[in-house]
């Protein structure tokens, strides 16, 4: 154990070894929070015998997640580093296992901006829109705002409507905004594709509608750690609350703002 605690100050040692219940650490840049997170993960595995696959550690960039995986591997020697990922990356793992609950295949497509632009090109060509009507950048922003704020139940169209029913909504749309939005949903459904916003709301929907799947993940994730807690948004906060509701072991790190 002393190897895992070597070089840590008193506050960091306390953060690493206080494993049960709700633990909040206020830490800014340069305070050694990444070291505390990685040592805490290694402590849970090496000293408490927790399987890496029963730990979720959320970071806010893929780069940070990769660096944390590397550090934990160096500490534990275990190639299994559990669920060390962004919220979106974790939701990909959930959906790859349980997308059948919303009648999506396990090999769904996760969209990036270039994929979205390719879909927009199809919509613009089909409906004679031009970039004067709305630029691709503005269209991407509009779609995100519609999904997050104006039409938060949009995902039900993707899940419950048939492809023909979505196409009918797209065909009936008569403003650039509605044409682009429903055309995009139709393209998503046609390709079994999900963007970053969809990943979280689909996961939340499955957890809300399917108690068996929700309990499976709640029981699996005995310990949850979240970095940069002050930056999480409302859907991410809801997801965190669902996941930690069973074991109630939550460790969060953030600056003094939260």
Task: State where each predicted segment sits.
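Residue-level signal for well-ordered alpha-helical positions
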Residues: 28, 40, 71, 75, ...
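Basic/charged alpha-beta structural segments of nucleotide/phosphate-handling enzymes
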Residues: 117, 121-193, 211
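ATP-binding Walker
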Residues: 31-32
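Conserved P-loop NTPase-based nucleic-acid remodeling module centered on helicase motor cores
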Residues: 54-141
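Conserved SF1/SF2 helicase motif Ia
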Residues: 44-60, 249
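Walker A/P-loop NTP-binding motif
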Residues: 35-50, 67, 71, 241
């Amino acid at each position: 154990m002393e190897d895992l605690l070597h070089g840590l100050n008193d506050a960091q040692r306390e953060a690493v070894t206080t494993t049960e219940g709700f633990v909040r650490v206020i830490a800014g840049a340069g305070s050694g929070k990444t070291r505390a997170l990685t040592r805490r993960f290694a402590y849970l595995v090496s000293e408490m015998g927790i399987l890496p696959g029963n730990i979720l550690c959320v970071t806010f960039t893929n780069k940070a997640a990769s660096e944390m995986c590397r550090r934990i591997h160096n500490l534990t020697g275990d190639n299994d580093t559990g669920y060390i990922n962004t919220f979106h990356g974790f939701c990909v793992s959930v959906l790859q296992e349980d997308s059948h609950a919303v009648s999506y295949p396990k090999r769904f497509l996760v969209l990036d901006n270039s994929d979205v632009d390719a879909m927009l090109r199809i919509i613009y060509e089909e409906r004679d829109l031009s970039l004067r009507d709305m630029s691709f950048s503005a269209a991407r922003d509009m779609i995100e705002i519609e999904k997050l704020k104006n039409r938060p139940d949009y995902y039900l169209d993707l899940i419950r409507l048939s492809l023909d029913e979505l196409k009918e909504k797209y065909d009936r749309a008569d403003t650039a905004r509605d044409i682009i939005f429903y055309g995009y949903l139709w393209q998503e459904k046609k390709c079994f594709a999900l963007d970053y916003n969809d990943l979280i709301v689909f996961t939340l929907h499955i957890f809300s509608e399917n108690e068996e799947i929700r309990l499976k993940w709640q029981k699996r994730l005995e310990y949850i750690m979240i970095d940069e807690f002050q930056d999480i948004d409302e859907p991410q906060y809801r997801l965190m609350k669902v996941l930690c509701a069973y074991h109630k072991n939550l460790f969060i790190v953030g600056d003094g703002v939260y």
